[in-house]
Amino acid sequence: MPPIRQAVSLAEKKAIRDYYNQSAHRIPQKEVTEWFRKTYNKDLSQSTISEILSPKYSYLDDGSVRLGDIKKIRAPKFPLLDNAVYEWLQQREVEGLPISGDMIKQAATRFWSKIPAYASLPLPDFSNGWLDKFRRRHYIQQSAVNQALESIKFEVFREYPVHIQEFIRPYAQKDIFCVGGTSLFWKLTPNKQNLDYQEIQGMKRGKAKVSLIMCCNADGSERLPLWIVGYAQNPRSFEQCGIFPKSMNFEWKWNGRASISPIIMEEWLRWFDTRMQGRKVLLMLESNDTYQFGVESVRRFKGGFQNTSVFRIPEKTLDIKSPFEQGIVDTFKANYRRYWLQYSLNQINILRDPLKAVNVLKAIRWMLWSWNFGVSEKTIQASFLRSGLLGPHSEAEGQGMESYQKAIMEIGNLISSKGSEAVKQINEYIRPSEEDETKLHQDAVDTVAAEFLEERRFESDEEEDVEPQISNVEAAMAFEVLIKYFEQHENGDPSFVLDLYRRQRVIAPNNLIA
């Protein structure tokens, strides 16, 4: 006999979403199920919990709306379409573009043909009745259509730099953060054109791409885990090697364009604000519509920012720049390209095609090395000074670029390229203009529709690469080798050896090697 289905009220659904969204870290749905059982004495299936946490019920997160009003509004019949149209609408608002009821219906028609989940279904009638229900679901006033919303704006300073510095002055440098994004063609090889789009087994090399969200504070004491966006929800190399991104200290996201979408940016902003709990920090963002969309979405719904003041770096000024454009991204990419080229040459020496041998997991390890060790505190500090955000920056010119220069030299040695022209080509290889997505115009409907493409299991054309699962005993033995190695150093660091002992005992407390 099948279990009796238990009714879940809107108030209970809202409580589930609040519990999940307000947790300090992302919690598994199993934990949400257990919490609900203890709190409400009801047993819900994981599929029910998953549905409640899906975008279908995102309207429950708006704290300004009463549950009594919500009861009058039915959930959308096609939630993916509803979410896509709403995100498109918000992008139009952010960009200050005109909006009309007919434009909303036309966007819905275009989205229908681009969302695979609806490919086999007949096109609905996007009538005035559908439009009215859409407006009511998202609390869009009639006056808000035909004009861009003006209720929420950034702190934008377009006059003199001193105004910006006065705004920043109350914050200690450890509490001043900047976030930036970039794309990375992680299989890119150097050539005369610096970016070769020749086909590799039917896939252009430029398609082997990820996008990254980077964030650090002004004194370089905190660099947050990278957020890396690819094409596949769970890349084949992750599954085959049994790895967990959080254990490697990065967050993995995905969509059909491997790009930083407004939805991902909104999620990142909430994640950042939660990490800053108990502090009052300033977050500076590059001038980018995606970032602006994310900030406005956070401010408009779900309680807004609790620990963070947001400031957008002016787009057109000679005096103020993003710190990421003053050395941080260049240093990161130079170190990544160095690791990738060294790997490529090693594979060529053993008669393997590096473009097939590499996979996104290997590339991510080089990204993590480059971010955590290639970009030094000195590089970050000097980049903030050169940005002009903290005051006059002339004394910072050329500082903090040692890691970048070293990587440039090593890349030149790897490809046997020397001279001023070679340096120019290496610089263009490290930072090709095609990776700067902010300069490329994207159709708003296509951009949003990419969020709903079917899942991929791979990032690029690559060979199978299965890494064996490491047992506790094997890990403990590896620690034993490390411990003996450092014990044999006459001037070794005893605190480091003790730390190895502690970690070994955590891994295999009952299987220590004598």
From Swiss-Prot:
Binds to centromeric K-type repeat DNA and ARS3002 DNA. The CBH-binding consensus sequence is Py-Pu-A-T-A-T-Py-Pu-T-A. One of its GO terms (molecular function) is centromeric DNA binding. It is found in: Nucleus; Chromosome, Centromere. Keywords: Centromere, Chromosome, DNA-binding, Nucleus. PROSITE patterns: HTH_CENPB. Pfam families: DDE_1, HTH_ABP1_N, HTH_Tnp_Tc5. It comes from the Eukaryota. InterPro entries: CenT-Element_Derived, DDE_SF_endonuclease_dom, Homeodomain-like_sf, HTH_ABP1_N, HTH_CenpB_DNA-bd_dom. Residues 69-144 form the HTH CENPB-type domain. This is CENP-B homolog protein 1. It comes from Schizosaccharomyces pombe (strain 972 / ATCC 24843). One of its GO terms (cellular component) is condensed chromosome, centromeric region.
